[in-house]
């Protein structure tokens, strides 16, 4: 008589125990777990039981649903955000999580579509809903003025999005930058002049002509010419333009930890310099640097007689 094999069904696990175990796994792996991880940790649990437990945790707002290159990820939800997303469906939670992960640099709707794999019409609907709840906000990026990036409502946009102190309503403040450029150079020139008038030996004069970026920053702040708060990084950006113009040179010295203006035991020092050789006339004239010089000829669309650069130079 042939032996009859009887398949033994595993006993039904307590749904609460399954949910608690999934929560424990999420705490062990804060960056998220896949369904395969849950299956490996609980091999005796049927797929349907896992799905029921996961869906219940998602509906209660205890888990976040993410999408990665390897598939779906489940991550423990921040308790502060759990109340914000109460009553939202899984698709809305997924979009919110993608925007949250983007931080203060924001994310375009096209990238949200790619990461969520949702239709664009559905994404636009979700974005409007989240904006109406003041959970997210749309910010125009200086990198692409016609495109908006989305970020959490309470975040301050990154400098790469707003352009920092040099932009106002997505417009580059060229006059403001020029004023800062002039004032920074004026301060360094004054420092160099004071060093020359001291009648010390050349080495002491040279060392005395240097100023740290913190000194320049403090001088600009005391002038009160800026309506926005400038950082030392902003001032160093201006000083770098002076270096590129050949008006200023920079040196880096070692500094004690905690010294004002030092970073990682180093300090940047700047001083005004004079050009070694005066520029020749052809370089100073617009023709010497004109980008359309080869196309310029009398009777043509570009000609010396209607050159706007030459007119401006002569008036100057």
UniProtKB/Swiss-Prot annotation:
Disulfide bonds: none annotated. One of its GO terms (molecular function) is metal ion binding. InterPro entries: RNA_pol_Rpc34, RNA_pol_Rpc34-like, WH-like_DNA-bd_sf, WH_DNA-bd_sf. [4Fe-4S] cluster binds at residues 287, 290, 296, 307. One of its GO terms (biological process) is positive regulation of innate immune response. The modification N-acetylalanine is found at residue 2. Coiled coil: none annotated. Gene3D superfamilies: Winged helix-like DNA-binding domain superfamily/Winged helix DNA-binding domain. There is a cross-link at residues 5, 7 (Glycyl lysine isopeptide (Lys-Gly) (interchain with G-Cter in SUMO2)). It is found in: Nucleus. Keywords: Acetylation, Antiviral defense, DNA-directed RNA polymerase, Immunity, Innate immunity, Iron, Iron-sulfur, Isopeptide bond, Metal-binding, Nucleus, Transcription, Ubl conjugation. SUPFAM superfamilies: Winged helix' DNA-binding domain. GO terms for cellular component: RNA polymerase III complex. It holds the Pfam family RNA_pol_Rpc34. Belongs to the eukaryotic RPC34/RPC39 RNA polymerase subunit family. The [4FE-4S] cluster-binding domain adopts a globular structure that serves as an interaction hub that connects the POLR3C/RPC3-POLR3F/RPC6-POLR3G/RPC7 heterotrimer to the Pol III core. Component of the RNA polymerase III complex consisting of 17 subunits: a ten-subunit horseshoe-shaped catalytic core composed of POLR3A/RPC1, POLR3B/RPC2, POLR1C/RPAC1, POLR1D/RPAC2, POLR3K/RPC10, POLR2E/RPABC1, POLR2F/RPABC2, POLR2H/RPABC3, POLR2K/RPABC4 and POLR2L/RPABC5; a mobile stalk composed of two subunits POLR3H/RPC8 and CRCP/RPC9, protruding from the core and functioning primarily in transcription initiation; and additional subunits homologous to general transcription factors of the RNA polymerase II machinery, POLR3C/RPC3-POLR3F/RPC6-POLR3G/RPC7 heterotrimer required for transcription initiation and POLR3D/RPC4-POLR3E/RPC5 heterodimer involved in both transcription initiation and termination. This is DNA-directed RNA polymerase III subunit RPC6. It comes from Mus musculus.
């Amino acid at each position: 008589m042939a032996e009859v094999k009887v398949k033994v069904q595993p006993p039904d696990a307590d749904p609460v125990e399954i949910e608690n175990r999934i929560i424990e796994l999420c705490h062990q792996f804060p960056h998220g777990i896949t369904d395969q991880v849950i299956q490996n940790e609980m091999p005796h649990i049927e797929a349907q039981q896992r799905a029921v437990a996961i869906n219940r945790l998602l509906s209660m707002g205890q888990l976040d649903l993410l999408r990665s290159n390897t598939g779906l990820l489940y991550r423990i939800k921040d308790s502060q955000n759990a109340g914000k997303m109460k009553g939202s469906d899984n698709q809305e939670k997924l979009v919110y999580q993608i925007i949250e992960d983007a931080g203060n640099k924001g994310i375009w709707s096209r990238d949200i579509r790619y990461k969520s794999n949702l239709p664009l019409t559905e994404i636009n609907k979700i974005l409007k809903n989240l904006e109406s709840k003041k959970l997210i906000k749309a910010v125009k990026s200086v990198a692409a003025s016609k495109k908006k990036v989305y970020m959490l409502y309470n975040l301050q946009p990154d400098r790469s999005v707003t352009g920092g102190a040099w932009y106002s309503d997505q417009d580059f403040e060229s006059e403001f930058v020029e004023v800062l450029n002039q004032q920074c150079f004026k301060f360094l020139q004054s420092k160099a002049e004071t060093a020359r008038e001291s009648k010390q030996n050349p080495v002491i004069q040279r060392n005395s002509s240097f100023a740290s970026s913190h000194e320049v920053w403090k001088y600009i702040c005391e002038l009160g010419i800026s309506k926005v708060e400038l950082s030392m990084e902003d001032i160093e950006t201006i000083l770098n333009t002076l270096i590129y113009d050949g008006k200023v040179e920079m040196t880096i010295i070692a500094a004690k930890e905690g010294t004002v203006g030092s970073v990682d035991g180093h300090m940047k020092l700047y001083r005004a310099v004079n050009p070694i050789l005066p520029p020749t006339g052809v370089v100073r004239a617009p023709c010497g640097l004109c980008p359309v010089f080869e196309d310029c000829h009398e009777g043509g669309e570009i000609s010396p007689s209607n050159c706007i650069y030459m007119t401006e130079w002569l008036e100057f």
